Design a protein with these regions (language model features):
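N-terminal charged segments
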Residues: 64-127, 192-193, 197
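A conserved beta-strand-loop-helix scaffold within acyl/acetyltransferase catalytic domains
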Residues: 192-239
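Acyl-donor-binding surface of acyltransferase catalytic domains
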Residues: 109-169, 174, 274, 292-294
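Conserved acetyl-CoA binding element of GNAT-fold acetyltransferases
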Residues: 100-110, 229-240
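A short beta-loop-alpha structural element at the N-terminal edge
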Residues: 67-72, 168-181
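Conserved active-site alpha-helix within GNAT-family acetyltransferase domains
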Residues: 138-148, 249, 270-288
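Conserved RNA-binding domains used in RNP assembly and mRNA/RNA metabolism
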Residues: 1-67
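Conserved acetyl-CoA-binding loop-helix of GNAT-fold acetyltransferases
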Residues: 114-121, 238, 244-257, 276, ...
């Protein structure tokens, strides 16, 4: 099978045993040296998975109309591979950052059975993970005793000309050292410095960042991903020592301007205060993600 046309494409690989893997692919052939992996033929690499041509039943290009959901899926696949797991569950897996809940979860298409949930729980335990996360487009009738939350997708629907901005601020691409410092200050106490550093390294490798500077000090930042006329703005953070100085709105206005006519959207916890701020700025709810999490060991 000629696998070269699938290089750097978003694909679904179906194996002879019926299992599936979805993500961005890299084509590797026998011309490369993969002896350490036992690979001596053409293969596709999706994340940490190397799939030889002899295992492959078929390959499908995941081509869908441009939309917010398609952009969200592409952004997720920068980090994780989605693979079949059970009748009602698919598994998102990021082996570079296996302890990040959002990148290593189970996506449900219908109410999972108790047997499916227990299998997923055992899978997590076998990996050495102390958490399990389920997510989907609708609330579960049986949440298996997990803590629930809802993340909103919010699309900008109004103008930005009345947004108050801070003229002291210069927006530019931040250096890694600056991003690491502000992320550690904000997230280190919440998640631990080790995880915070590994997470920012992961994000910095795959996404574009913009930072708000007052002088040479980074006082706020966000990252973004654009695809087919849609731009997702995420990871908005403001230095706690510089709150109430319109830094967030200055950053968001720059993001909208740089998007150059794209549909701009972001995410907010349904029950958190930032949602109200976004609504005042003209962002409106267009989608929901229902999430269920347990971090008990």
């Amino acid at each position: 099978m000629n696998l070269s046309p699938y290089n750097d494409k978003k694909i679904k690989v179906i194996l002879h045993d019926g299992s599936t893997f979805e993500g961005f692919a890299t084509h590797n052939s026998f011309e490369y040296s993969y002896a350490e992996f036992g690979v001596d033929a053409e293969c596709l690499q999706l994340g940490e998975y190397l799939i030889r041509d002899e295992e492959i039943e078929s390959v499908e290009l995941l081509e869908s109309p441009a939309s917010i959901r398609n952009t969200e899926e592409e952004m997720a696949m920068l980090f994780s591979v989605r693979r079949s797991f059970s009748e009602h569950l698919k598994r998102w897996e990021d082996n570079e950052l296996p302890d990040k809940y959002d990148n290593n979860c189970f996506e449900y298409s219908a109410q999972p059975t108790q047997e499916e949930f227990e299998r997923a729980l055992n899978y997590q335990k076998e990996r050495g993970d102390s958490f399990i996360k389920l997510e989907g487009d609708f609330p579960l009738a049986d949440d298996f005793g997990l803590d629930s939350s809802v993340t909103l997708t919010m699309q900008l629907t109004g103008p930005t000309d009345r947004w108050i901005v801070n003229d002291e601020i210069e927006i530019r691409e931040p250096g890694y050292k600056d991003i690491k410092e502000i992320e550690l200050k904000h997230y280190g106490p919440l998640y631990g410095e080790d995880f915070a550093v590994r997470n920012i390294n992961h994000l910095f490798e795959y996404l574009d960042f913009r930072g708000a500077y007052i002088g040479e000090r980074l006082v706020g930042a966000y990252y973004f991903y654009s695809s087919d006329g849609y731009t997702c703005v995420d990871g908005l953070i403001v230095d706690e020592d510089f709150r109430c100085r319109h830094i967030a709105t200055t950053l968001l206005k720059h993001a909208v301007s740089e998007a150059s006519g794209d549909v701009v959207f972001l995410h907010a916890d349904q029950d958190d205060y930032p949602r109200k701020i976004y609504e005042k700025l003209g962002f409106a709810e267009v989608d929901k993600l229902y999430e269920y999490l347990s971090t008990e060991k």
